[in-house]
UniProtKB/Swiss-Prot annotation:
Name assigned to this protein: Iron-sulfur cluster assembly protein SufC
Upper taxonomic lineage: Eukaryota, Sar, Alveolata, Apicomplexa, Aconoidasida
EC number of this enzyme: 3.6.1.-
GO cellular component, one term: apicoplast
Cellular location(s): Plastid, Apicoplast
Binding site residues for ATP: 152-159
Gene ablation phenotype (knockout): Repeated attempts to isolate gene deletion mutant failed, suggesting an essential role of the gene during asexual blood stage growth.
Keywords assigned: 4Fe-4S, Apicoplast, ATP-binding, Hydrolase, Iron, Iron-sulfur, Metal-binding, Nucleotide-binding, Plastid
InterPro entries (alphabetical): ABC_transporter-like_ATP-bd (IPR003439), ABC_transporter-like_CS (IPR017871), FeS-cluster_ATPase_SufC (IPR010230), P-loop_NTPase (IPR027417)
Gene Ontology MF: a single term: ATP binding
Organism: Plasmodium berghei (strain Anka)
Pathway: Cofactor biosynthesis; iron-sulfur cluster biosynthesis
Gene name tied to this protein: SufC
Subunit structure: Component of a complex composed of SufB, SufC and SufD in a stoichiometric ratio of 1:2:1. Interacts with SufB. Interacts with SufD; the interaction enhances the ATPase activity of SufC.
Functional note: Participates in the sulfur mobilization (SUF) pathway for iron-sulfur (Fe-S) cluster biogenesis. As part of a complex consisting of SufB-SufC(2)-SufD, involved in assembly of [4Fe-4S] clusters. Exhibits ATPase activity.
């Protein structure tokens, strides 16, 4: 009898468990129908969605990166393997994008020191965006060994003239001519002008956050050394050269490891421009308000360097508002600009007249 009792009880317990399991399953199904899923399942589903989206994003990035890499590779391949190019023009256009290490012409065979270093005749230039005319008939002649200064009111076109000579892409020459060492300057690229010996120290030096100063300077110097048939400098050789040069401008060696002009003070930026001038040794230096924004010590240091660097083998075009720098450099000629034209040229005595009576005496309103 006892065995039969436990058998009946076991069957009864199993029946209850099965009914409970059925009820639980039924409740879960009802929740699923009406959108009431368990939090655990929701979290699991959300996690799966995030993982899926992350994978899709990574796949997209992979294809985009490889697309860019393939494009660069194909361009290089096309330029080196001529089977993809149908004409000589196509081959030349592709090769122009590669670094050109060949020598270029930096002066006319007929040019000598008795011929003007820079000769500008009736120069007109406009802004590329907007088409506003800034330069309206500039005439300027500079010989080797001379120092010229451009002065004038704000907005008269001084900085624009400096940038047009250097080949700034924001401006376009519409009329007139510029010759440098006998070459037609308007036909030359910015890099070509630099190799010819033209150097521009910006009023507001550009920041290059991703380029270290030593890499920038060494690359620029090696371009000039190649042009002069001199061996390129390795990083270690360049560092040795810079030990003395960087001291001249009052900067520490750690300065070379910093990005170009990024996070620099105003004085450091200007001294960095002067450092470039010392390294590249250009024959024509354009200083666009290099003296502005400098404290007393930085101004004295900068002006002393410019004065020592100036010699019979180079020329200067100095854009400034201040008499103090001109007192030290003693330019041969002073030019006054107004509304895109040079309206007056004279010797250093013009500086004293400007200092006493301003520009109104030279301007016909």
């Amino acid at each position: 009898m006892r065995g039969q009792f436990w058998l009946v009880m076991s069957c009864y317990i199993i029946t209850i468990i099965c009914k409970l399991a059925f009820c639980i399953k039924l409740i879960e199904n009802e929740k699923s129908i009406f959108g009431f899923k368990s939090k655990k399942k929701d979290m699991k589903k959300l996690s799966n969605i995030k993982v899926r989206n992350w994978k899709q994003k990574k796949i997209q990035q992979f294809f985009i990166i490889n697309k860019v890499k393939n494009k660069k590779y194909n361009n290089l391949k096309k330029s080196l393997n001529m089977e993809y190019s149908n004409t000589d023009d196509q081959r030349l256009s592709l090769l122009k994008n590669l670094e050109n290490k060949s020598k270029i012409i930096t002066q006319s065979p007929a040019w000598n020191e008795k011929i003007p270093l820079l000769e500008i005749n009736d120069l007109h230039a406009i802004e590329v965006e907007g088409g506003k005319e800034i330069l309206k008939g500039i005439n300027l002649t500079i010989y080797l060994g001379e120092k010229h200064s451009i002065m004038g009111r704000n907005g008269s076109g001084k900085s624009t003239l400096a940038k047009v000579i250097a080949g700034h892409p924001y401006f376009k020459v519409t009329k007139g001519s510029m010759k440098f060492k006998g070459l037609n300057l308007t036909d030359l690229t910015v890099n070509h002008r630099s190799l010819c010996g033209i150097f521009l120290a910006f009023q507001y030096p550009i920041e290059l956050p991703m380029v270290k100063n030593n890499e920038f300077l060494r690359t620029a110097l090696n371009c000039h050394r190649r042009q002069n048939n001199e061996p390129e400098l390795s990083p270690s050789e360049f560092d040795l050269l810079m030990i003395n040069e960087i001291k001249k401008v009052g900067l520490s060696p750690e300065f070379l490891d910093r990005p170009v002009n990024y996070g620099f003070s105003g004085g450091e930026k200007k001294r960095n421009e002067i450092l470039q001038m010392l390294i590249l040794k250009p024959s024509f230096c354009i200083l666009d308000e290099t003296d502005s924004g400098l404290d007393v010590d930085s101004f004295k240091l900068t002006s002393d360097i410019i004065q020592k660097f100036s010699n019979i083998n180079n020329s200067f075009l100095i854009v400034t508002h201040y008499k103090k720098l001109l007192e030290l450099l003693k330019p041969n000629y002073i030019h006054i600009m107004h509304k895109g034209k040079i309206i007056k040229t004279g010797n250093y005595s013009l500086v004293d007249k400007i200092e006493s009576d301003g520009y109104a005496q030279f301007v016909e309103e």
